[in-house]
Amino acid sequence: MEQKQEKFSTIGYIAAALGMCIGTGNVWRFPRVCAANGGGAFIIAWTIAMLVFAVPLLSTEMAFGKKTRLGCIGTFRDAGGKKYTWMGFFVAAVCFFLMSYYCVLQGYCMKYAVNSVTSAFKPNLSTETTSAMWTAFTDSQAQVILFHAIGFALACFIVYQGIAGGIEKFCKVAIPALFIILVGLAIYAVTLNGASQGLQYLFTVKKEYILSPNTWIQAFIQAAWSTGAGWGFIITYANYVGEEEDVPTSCLIMGLGLSLIHISEPTRLALIS
C-alpha cells in the first residue's frame, strides 16, 4: 500500500519557510548594507525589490514545486525539459555549499547561546574582552568542531522527526520566539540615549542614494539574500504543501514577515550602536 506523504499545515508551512529565509542575510547583512546605502532610501528600494522580484520568484518556485512534487533537479527537468536539468544540479550544488557555510555559523551561535546561559557575558563588557573571547573560541579547534557537531546533530534530529513532528513543530515555536526577541530588543533600543538620532539616521530618505544605481543593485541583491529566492529551497518545501494552499498569499505573508524582521533588526543595531 502506498504510504501517504506528510503535508505542512498552512501555518506550519509559512513558519518553516520563514525559518528557511531568516538567517545571516537578514540579521547580519541587512543592517550593514542598509546603513551603507542611505538608510531610508535603501529600505524603499529593498521593499520594491521584494515586491517585483523576490515574492514573484518565490511564488514561481512554490508553484513549480507544488505541481511537480519533485526535488530541485527533477523540477527543472520536468518544467524546462532535459536540457535544463543541469540548472537543477547547479542549484542543488549551491545549496550544499551554503549548508556547509551555515553549519559553521550554527556552531558559533550554539557557543554564544551557551555563553549567554552560563553568564559568560556580563554587563558592560569591553570590546577587548569580547574580542579575546571570540579569539579564544575560534583558536580552539576542539571547541569549534564540538559546537559545529552539536548544531548539526540537532538539525538532523529535527529533520529525522519528519514534517509535522519535526520541522513544523519546531518552527511553530522557534519563529514566534524569534519575532518576540527581535521586537523586544528593538523596543529596548528605543529607550536608550540617542534613540531619536539613530531613528533619523536609519529612516531619512536621502535623494543622492535613492537616485544611485548602486543602491538599487544592492537592494535587489539583498532581496535575494533575504528570501532565498532562486536557491531552490521553496521548490523542495512546496512538495509538502496541500493542493488547497494559495501560492501568492503564502509568499506575500512570508514577505511581510521578513519585512518585520528587517525593520526591527536594523532599528535595534542603529540605536544600540
Features from the language model and the residues they span:
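Inter-helical loop and helix-membrane interface segments of multi-pass membrane transporters/permeases
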Residues: K4, R32-N37, I73-F89, V104-Y160, ...
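Transmembrane helix-boundary motif of multi-pass solute transporters/channels
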Residues: G12-I48, G232-V241, T249-L252, L256-S259
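Hydrophobic, small-residue-rich membrane helices and short re-entrant helix-turn-helix hairpins
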Residues: I158-P176, G198, L211-W216, A229-I261
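Helix-loop-helix hairpins and the membrane-proximal interhelical loops
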Residues: C171-T227
